[in-house]
Amino acid sequence: MQIFVKTLTGKTITLEVESSDTIDNVKQKIQDKEGIPPDQQRLIFAGKQLEDGRTLSDYNIQKESTLHLVLRLRGGMQIFVKTLTGKTITLEVESSDTIDNVKQKIQDKEGIPPDQQRLIFAGKQLEDGRTLSDYNIQKESTLHLVLRLRGGMQIFVKTLTGKTITLEVESSDTIDNVKQKIQDKEGIPPDQQRLIFAGKQLEDGRTLSDYNIQKESTLHLVLRLRGGMQIFVKTLTGKTITLEVESSDTIDNVKQKIQDKEGIPPDQQRLIFAGKQLEDGRTLSDYNIQKESTLHLVLRLRGGQ
């Protein structure tokens, strides 16, 4: 169904929703349209602030209802972040924000990945899981941003096509971290990556230093095709989508791949095989789905009007 969201500036946003959508989902859709982070949004309907975990139907929000969007300024404040170059960044934060949140805001403004940021206040390095109020950081406080170069180094990743990727890493980075960096650069999902060094396949939870990988070492990237296979997904329009999967992939993974290809959110997808609706947490092998099997994709309209 359609609902409307009215902002304090008078702008009205139209959203496609289902009555089973949670308030979190709605805030996500608003972020997608308007770029406003969910944690800055307060949604009001019939004079009541809506809670994230509840659904539209819980609040009896029906088609063409109008919600009001207010930006959260409760506890909101400005703080400053000073870099080693002398640049000062101004951030809108709340005292309940975690250090992770602050690093994310710095990334949004400056493009510096959180894992390269160290934040210092009153001579103390701030820990990710703690909040600004834990450190008694108040409005117009100044934090200092230091880039983490401890153990920082370049390594190379060579693909089977002969392409070489350069990565900025630290010896304390895990293999998971490295795969994430490769995804950021090349778009290859971590679960399709196998990394080889000195003839040995590297395990996700281990660090570069565990494997004695030093600056300017070269890793080899092999795409995981063990158990890999193609399956087909047929839509009601008759379109057939081809997916590269593994029998150990969960139905969630498959829905994610469909979203990547077709843009259909996983929560709108129902997948059918052999007359049975497939459950998210189960794997393809649980359902005996083999190479070149065909699944049927039905769009969830339950609650939609």
Curated annotation (Swiss-Prot):
Record flagged with keyword Nucleus: yes
Cross-link (Glycyl lysine isopeptide (Lys-Gly) (interchain with G-Cter in ubiquitin)): K6, K11, K27, K29, K33, K48, K63
GO molecular function: protein tag activity; ubiquitin protein ligase binding
GO terms under cellular component: cytoplasm; nucleus
Broad class of where this protein is predominantly found: cytoplasm
Record-listed cross-link Glycyl lysine isopeptide (Gly-Lys) (interchain with K-? in acceptor proteins), residues: G76
Domain Ubiquitin-like, first and last residues per copy: 1-76, 77-152, 153-228, 229-304
Pfam families: ubiquitin
One of the GO BP terms on file: protein ubiquitination
Localisation per UniProt entry: Cytoplasm; Nucleus
Keyword line: Cytoplasm, Isopeptide bond, Nucleus, Repeat, Ubl conjugation
Positions of the propeptide removed during maturation: 305
Remaining remarks: Ubiquitin is encoded by 3 different genes. Crp-79 is synthesized as a polyprotein with one copy of ubiquitin fused to ribosomal protein eL40. Crp-6/ubi-3 is a polyprotein with one copy of ubiquitin fused to ribosomal protein eS31. Ubi is a polyprotein containing 4 exact head to tail repeats of ubiquitin. For the sake of clarity sequence features are annotated only for the first chain, and are not repeated for each of the following chains.
Family, similarity comment: Belongs to the ubiquitin family.
Its biological purpose: Ubiquitin exists either covalently attached to another protein, or free (unanchored). When covalently bound, it is conjugated to target proteins via an isopeptide bond either as a monomer (monoubiquitin), a polymer linked via different Lys residues of the ubiquitin (polyubiquitin chains) or a linear polymer linked via the initiator Met of the ubiquitin (linear polyubiquitin chains).
Descriptive protein name: Polyubiquitin
Organism, scientific name: Neurospora crassa (strain ATCC 24698 / 74-OR23-1A / CBS 708.71 / DSM 1257 / FGSC 987)
Lineage: Eukaryota, Fungi, Dikarya, Ascomycota, Pezizomycotina
Name of the gene: ubi
